[in-house]
């Protein structure tokens, strides 16, 4: 009876906290909640169908083991593993894992996955570009495999099962969330006061799904370089592959005229860094003044064309990489363009080592985005495993392909500007891109952010979203920042941190201040390892926007 009363009391306290103003909630670092159950009592715990917002056959805890953190010997947690069972008996289970700290800060963080998922993300690390280990900070940390199991994250064959595909698209997120709430409530006697999500790439797409589709349930979200323009990015992979390989015919002409060998690609990148590195005030191998560099791209392109004897076909490949493409028709979300990358400003084009296209395309040998696009078109969009990616006209699709593209955009894209539920829930979003990301275009993510501003206005967007773009950052790599602490301050106090926020740059090991868009990091003098030696400049060449973005 005493245990029951204690659990009820703690649940009532949690409810009071949830309805209190944000200013009344202690920070994570000031909160410690202890379990009300023994860890082993979780084993065999059934999660009823009624606990899930989406249709399932319930869930179950399979194992629960007390574990000591590998990075902090004073931190102990319960490593919980479980299943969420599908309605379709031929569909895979959702496998999830949850870390429950013995000293809990009252918050949870759900970590997103990568590529086509198929495995549970690592829960004991810092996550995408993170600077903090969440379990060591007292967070409940959890994640799932997106609703199927695969040896390779590139495997898209699971999509032949409708429930598995629906789970991957978005449903696994809220199902895992519901499992977390149920298990957490059982173990601590209450749900989290604040529920966070953090992810990059596919995990970034998942982050935006949480903010838009499930915005009423999440309090703070970190979204890193999201694969949110899902159909457009996979079409970019198809169009880039065509630019590289369209001349290839194994019998008549076994050459890919658009292919650029790896040595030349690396030399172009080195030339760009050498030319633009000092524009930010310091030569440190990081191109920070991306705007001035991009405004010079026509001159730079002329230089490298002459230096390396680039052909018309090779220039087309570079054009697709740098500028993306524009369609005469729009996706279901209204977008008709993919804006390309910083390929001529120090980014690394990845065309693979081999000019011979495999079938299916293989990223070990071929264009990096080719195999990802190939799998998505085969299993997600066309449902045709014999689809040959480079054999179709994406600029002028026939009616059948057009209809499939529209249906796919409606289902898979995660670039909705509808944050009404998230805003009403007082949700907070940190949105992040890297100038050197060659997987998810920073220029495309800028366009997406502008869509938010167009819908809500800058002042309203600023109240729930901070958008940073940083130099020297590739795809979910190259930087470490304490975004969990920033989100916690924002959600707990109602105010975003007012002090200058710094991140650690992998390229130098030093710090730089976070550059809120459209700012860029400028060196002012002093110790280059000290973030205080930099400022955030908003100096942008006249006429830049609408021409070079």
What are these regions (language model features)?
Residues 190-201:
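Alpha/beta-hydrolase fold nucleophile elbow
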Residues 23-105, 120-129, 276-279, 287, ...:
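Catalytic-loop region of hydrolases
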Residues 430-433:
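Short beta-strand/loop motif that positions the catalytic acidic residue
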Residues 4-22:
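Sec-dependent N-terminal signal peptides of Gram-positive bacterial secreted proteins and lipoproteins
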Residues 199-209:
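Glycine-rich nucleophile elbow surrounding the catalytic serine of serine-hydrolase chemistry
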Residues 464-477, 506-507:
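Histidine-bearing beta->alpha loop at or near hydrolase active sites
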Residues 209-211, 216-326, 469:
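A catalytic-pocket lid/entrance helix-loop region that shapes and gates access to the active site
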Residues 105, 114-189, 235, 387-402, ...:
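Cap/lid segment of the alpha/beta-hydrolase catalytic domain
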């Amino acid at each position: 009876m005493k245990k029951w009363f204690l659990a009820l009391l703690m649940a009532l306290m949690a409810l009071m906290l949830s309805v209190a103003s944000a200013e009344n909630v202690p920070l994570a670092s000031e909160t410690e909640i202890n379990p009300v159950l023994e860890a082993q009592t979780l084993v065999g715990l059934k999660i009823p169908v009624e606990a899930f917002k989406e249709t399932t056959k319930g869930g179950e805890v399979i194992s629960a083991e007390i574990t000591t953190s590998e990075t902090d010997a004073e931190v102990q947690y319960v490593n919980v593993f479980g299943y969420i069972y599908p309605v379709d008996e031929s569909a895979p289970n959702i496998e999830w894992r949850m870390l429950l700290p013995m000293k809990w800060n009252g918050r949870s963080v759900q970590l997103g996955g990568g590529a086509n998922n198929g495995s549970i993300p690592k829960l004991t690390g810092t996550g995408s570009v993170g600077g903090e280990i969440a379990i060591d900070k007292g967070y409940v940390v959890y994640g799932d495999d997106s609703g199927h199991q695969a040896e390779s994250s590139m495997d898209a064959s699971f999509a032949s099962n409708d429930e598995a595909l629906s789970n991957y698209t978005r449903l696994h997120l809220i199902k895992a969330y519901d499992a977390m709430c149920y298990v957490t409530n059982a173990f601590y006697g209450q749900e989290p006061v604040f529920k966070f999500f953090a992810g990059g790439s596919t995990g970034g797409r998942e982050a935006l799904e949480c903010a838009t589709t499930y915005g009423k349930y999440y309090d703070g979200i970190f979204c890193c370089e999201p694969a949110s323009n899902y159909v457009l990015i996979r079409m970019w992979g198809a169009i880039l592959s065509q630019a590289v390989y369209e001349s290839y015919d194994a019998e008549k002409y076994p050459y890919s005229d658009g292919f650029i060998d790896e040595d030349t690609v690396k030399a172009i990148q080195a030339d760009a860094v050498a030319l633009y590195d000092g524009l930010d005030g310091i030569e440190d191998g990081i191109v920070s003044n991306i705007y001035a560099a991009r405004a010079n791209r026509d001159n730079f392109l002329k230089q490298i064309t002459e230096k390396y004897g680039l052909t018309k076909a090779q220039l087309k490949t570079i054009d697709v990489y740098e500028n993306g493409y524009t369609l005469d028709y729009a996706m279901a979300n209204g977008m008709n363009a993919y804006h390309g990358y910083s390929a001529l400003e120090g980014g690394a084009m990845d065309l693979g080592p081999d000019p011979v296209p495999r079938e299916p395309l293989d990223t070990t040998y071929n264009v990096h985005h080719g195999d990802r696009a190939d799998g998505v078109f085969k299993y997600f969009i066309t449902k045709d495993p014999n689809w040959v990616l480079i054999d179709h006209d994406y600029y002028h699709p026939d009616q059948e392909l057009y209809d499939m593209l529209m249906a796919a955009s409606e289902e898979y894209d995660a670039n909705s500007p509808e944050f009404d539920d998230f805003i009403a829930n007082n949700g907070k979003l940190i949105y992040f891109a890297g100038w050197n990301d060659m997987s998810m275009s920073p220029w495309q993510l800028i366009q997406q952010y502008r869509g938010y501003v167009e819908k809500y206005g800058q002042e309203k967007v600023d109240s729930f979203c901070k958008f940073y773009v940083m130099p020297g950052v590739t795809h979910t790599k190259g930087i470490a920042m304490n975004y969990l602490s920033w989100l916690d301050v924002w959600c707990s106090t109602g105010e975003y941190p007012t002090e200058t926020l710094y991140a650690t740059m992998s390229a130098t090991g030093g710090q730089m201040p976070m550059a809120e868009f459209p700012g860029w990091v400028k060196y002012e003098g002093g110790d280059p390892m000290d973030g205080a030696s930099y400022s955030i400049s908003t100096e942008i060449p006249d006429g830049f926007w609408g021409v070079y973005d």
